[in-house]
């Protein structure tokens, strides 16, 4: 077995070229077993096996620097750079992250997880190399899906000016997470069709040299191409045509479904844990499709992640032209939504919290200054969301809640969410964002009659005295739990408030609390700095009201344990009660 003997790239070079396909199969076998038990990004890694072997066969990592875009396709790279045990031994599966990480290896240069960044990052490495008078190759690896992102195109535009060694390997599998969208993919298709020979070549048009490899899963062909461009003195694109999910029939057949997988049965490809519970994605999709049937102005927008809103391939077909995928281009999604709204449409944009930061300028400039009535729904903005350091959803509250004109709402239940959507999709006075709760969806069957157009009116769910607990969104349930425990342990009848609004204060209610309360507790699912609780604390600043803010510390967490993080931040009912009693 070749893989067991590989401790670094130097061991790859010892294998004869005609034996490298054996190594490729061993890598796929290991990936398959690990994915079936552990889950992870599937299709991107299976398609990149030969290219990764060829890169390490030809180049001298880490002297030659390889930068992976997103880096979700870096599993084979990790296996060849001293981390194979994390893929061969089940007890070591969690030793590595799902993305490149300089803390793991000198062969990783950046911690990344968002798309379209590799060309710009690698261009910076190349520029620094040139300024220092050093040599060595710099290689940016980027997938065709990531080319729809603005930063990728900006990076390509700059790359031509380097006029020194810079290699851009474009892994073209004719897929993003789902199908690609955008005009540039017509050119990629033409390049594939003509074996890279067409004169209409977007890379050449940007001033880059160009090499095409049709057999992108043929390790010998890749080695030949990489040897041709090694030590080149001009920026060059090596465009390789690969098969996403190669080597596992279900993944080759259903590429979108197998972009990422949970644990599954290898023989059948069926998931071991079939989640059939209703969630906010399916609720959103059902709601929008129903709206679309009766209103042609309703438009659902995604930036390369259609299933975040529940729009699987069949649902996208059902929506037809009322569903728009702009590619991995969050900025364009927001600006497009603003344009649709200004011209009388009803745009809905669904996005992961981690990607909201990429939209900040457009939300502020193109939407809120213009007061465009868009609806923007934030998914996974929670401690219960994705837990990789590159995909944390902790920062959307301070980012969005401080933009003028925006109404940022936080439902605690399915019914509240749908009521907010009903209001937001029909009103024309405000841009609206909705932060979905983390964790399992709560549905209490209640009928929500609240008029959300009467801004910043909190709801008192239970009237008490002395202590008021304001639980925002996800943590409204925690507020109720803490109040119940206070009554059981200290006979304190606490007021419980569902604020709904992240962007504004119910000053009348907060003022009224001064009459018979001496402590206000705020709970929010995000970082405290610049967040919801600080606004409450500032309101009471010169009064005698004691304010206790609970949320998350400002820090980067990686692959964390949710319960541990909650306890560290005193976000349990028991700890909150203990804190209250300690100061009473």
Predicted regions and their residues:
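Non-catalytic terminal/interface segments that mediate subunit docking, oligomerization
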Residues: 248-357, 362-372, 470-473
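Cofactor-binding active-site loop characterized by glycine-rich and histidine/acidic residues
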Residues: 41-162, 298, 303, 312-313, ...
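Glycine-rich ThDP/TPP pyrophosphate-binding loop and its adjacent helix/strand module
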Residues: 108-264, 270-277, 282-284, 406-517
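Peripheral docking tails and interdomain loops at the edges
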Residues: 263, 269-274, 385-387, 398, ...
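N-terminal amphipathic, basic-rich helices that act as targeting or association modules
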Residues: 1-79, 215
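A glycine-rich helix N-cap at a beta->alpha junction
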Residues: 86-96, 161-175, 368-380
């Amino acid at each position: 077995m070749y893989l067991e003997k590989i401790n670094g790239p130097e061991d790859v070079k010892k294998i004869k070229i005609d034996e490298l396909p054996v190594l490729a199969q061993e890598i796929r076998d290991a990936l398959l077993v690990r994915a079936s038990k552990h889950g992870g990004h599937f299709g991107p890694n299976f398609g990149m096996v030969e290219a990764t072997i060829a890169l390490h066969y030809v180049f001298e990592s880490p002297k030659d620097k390889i930068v992976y875009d997103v880096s979700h396709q870096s599993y084979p790279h990790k296996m060849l750079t001293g981390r194979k045990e994390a893929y061969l031994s089940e007890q070591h599966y969690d030793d590595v992250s799902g993305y490149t990480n300089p803390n793991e290896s000198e062969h990783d240069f950046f911690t990344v997880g968002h798309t379209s960044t590799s060309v710009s990052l690698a261009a910076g490495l190349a520029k620094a190399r040139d300024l220092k008078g050093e040599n060595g190759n710099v290689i940016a690896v980027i997938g065709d899906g990531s080319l729809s992102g603005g930063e990728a195109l900006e990076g390509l535009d700059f790359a031509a000016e380097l006029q020194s060694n810079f290699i851009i390997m474009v892994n073209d599998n004719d897929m993003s997470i789902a199908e690609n969208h955008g005009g540039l993919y017509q050119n990629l298709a033409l390049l594939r069709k003509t074996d890279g020979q067409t004169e209409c070549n977007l890379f050449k048009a940007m001033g880059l040299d160009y090499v095409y490899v049709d057999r992108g899963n043929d390790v010998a062909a890749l080695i030949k191409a990489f040897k041709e461009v090694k030590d080149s003195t001009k920026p060059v694109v090596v465009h390789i045509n690969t098969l996403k999910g190669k080597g596992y029939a279900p993944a080759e057949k259903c590429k979108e479904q197998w972009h990422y997988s949970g644990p599954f049965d290898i023989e059948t490809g069926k998931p071991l844990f079939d989640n059939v519970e209703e969630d906010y994605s399916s609720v959103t999709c059902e709601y929008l499709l129903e709206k679309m049937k009766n209103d042609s102005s309703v438009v659902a927008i995604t930036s390369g992640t259609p299933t975040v809103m529940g729009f699987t391939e069949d649902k996208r077909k059902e929506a037809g032209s009322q569903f728009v995928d702009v590619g991995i281009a969050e900025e364009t999604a927001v600006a497009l939504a603003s344009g649709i709204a200004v011209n009388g449409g009803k745009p809905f944009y669904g996005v992961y919290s981690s990607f909201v930061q990429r939209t900040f300028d457009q939300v502020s400039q193109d939407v809120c200054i213009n007061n465009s009535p868009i609806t923007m729904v934030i998914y996974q903005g929670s401690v219960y969301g994705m837990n990789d350091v590159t995909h944390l959803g902790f920062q959307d509250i301070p980012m969005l809640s401080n933009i003028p004109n925006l109404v940022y709402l936080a439902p605690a239940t399915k019914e509240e969410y749908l009521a907010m959507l009903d209001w937001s999709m029909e009103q024309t006075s405000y841009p609206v964002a909705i932060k979905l709760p983390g964790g399992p969806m709560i549905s209490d069957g209640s009928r929500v009659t609240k008029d959300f157009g009467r801004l910043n009116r909190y709801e008192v769910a239970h009237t008490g005295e002395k202590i008021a607990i304001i639980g925002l969104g996800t943590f409204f349930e925690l507020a109720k739990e803490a109040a119940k425990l206070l009554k059981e342990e200290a006979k304190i009848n606490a007021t419980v408030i569902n604020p709904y609004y992240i962007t504004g204060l119910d000053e009348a209610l907060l003022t009224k609390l001064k009459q018979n309360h001496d402590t206000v507790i705020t709970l929010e699912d995000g970082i405290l700095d610049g967040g919801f609780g600080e606004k409450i604390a500032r309101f009471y600043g010169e009064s005698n009201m004691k304010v206790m803010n609970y949320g998350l510390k400002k820090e980067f967490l990686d692959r964390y344990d949710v319960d541990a993080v909650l306890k560290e931040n005193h976000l349990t009912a028991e700890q909150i009660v203990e804190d209250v009693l300690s100061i009473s």
